[in-house]
């Protein structure tokens, strides 16, 4: 997105929604089943730290901080969008904003706030920093998996197998958010992929696809128990 386009979008969004207001339409693309997935994961793991890449204007950030007691660390590459998110979310507690590349953001967190000695519970990662040709998802997953044993990742805009009604991001070539592109990455880091159990026509809001990832073993066993999710064919 060009700087001019970003400024135009930011100005329009500020006029339409100058402050974050909790509602069914706020966060996770206004998708109620997506929120159910997160609620199930929160009940299973009681996350104390949530990390988001791709703040955009802060709707999901606001949802996360108003529905949990977790500390939220969020990163946005576009300075204009980050400024807008900060303005819309001012007054809300436990949000730590960073402007910059999501990969460096994660590396910095693992050298500071995400040191094992500071963590008593698994960490939830919401990865939504994929608007550009330089798709950071594979690197983000590698950084997380190299540094933590207990975590859950949710990737927005990911293709849901056999459910074409859920949208996904396709930037051409190998820059497609689907299993064809990322299955080898998941296998390399021994992550099991889970998808929404709800058929796409029954979802609300943007009806964007997602995948939830957890390390094989104890973590993935808990995801198997979440009725809002289904395991990909193994």
Model-derived segments and their meaning:
Residues 1-124, 129-234:
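A short alpha-helical cap/connector motif
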């Amino acid at each position: 997105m060009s700087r001019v386009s970003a400024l135009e979008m930011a100005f329009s969004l500020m006029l339409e929604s100058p402050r974050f207001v909790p509602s069914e339409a706020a966060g996770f693309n206004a998708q109620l089943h997506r929120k159910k997935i997160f609620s199930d994961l929160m009940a299973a793991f009681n996350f104390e730290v949530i990390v988001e890449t791709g703040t955009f204007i802060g709707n999901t950030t606001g949802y996360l901080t108003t529905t949990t007691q977790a500390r939220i660390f969020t990163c946005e590459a576009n300075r204009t969008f980050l400024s807008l998110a900060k303005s819309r979310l001012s007054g809300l507690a436990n949000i730590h904003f960073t402007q910059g590349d999501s990969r460096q953001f994660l590396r910095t967190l693992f050298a500071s706030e995400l040191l094992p000695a500071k963590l008593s519970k698994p960490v939830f990662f919401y990865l939504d920093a994929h608007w550009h040709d330089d798709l950071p998802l594979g690197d983000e997953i590698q950084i997380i998996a190299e540094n933590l044993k207990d975590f859950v990742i949710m990737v927005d805009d990911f293709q849901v197998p056999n459910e074409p009604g859920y949208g996904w991001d396709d930037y051409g070539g190998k820059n497609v958010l689907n299993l064809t592109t990322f299955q080898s990455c998941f296998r390399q880091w021994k992550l099991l992929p889970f998808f929404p159990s709800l058929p796409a026509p029954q979802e609300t809001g943007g009806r964007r696809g997602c995948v939830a990832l957890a390390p094989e073993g104890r973590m993935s066993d808990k995801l198997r128990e979440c009725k809002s999710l289904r395991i990909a064919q193994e």
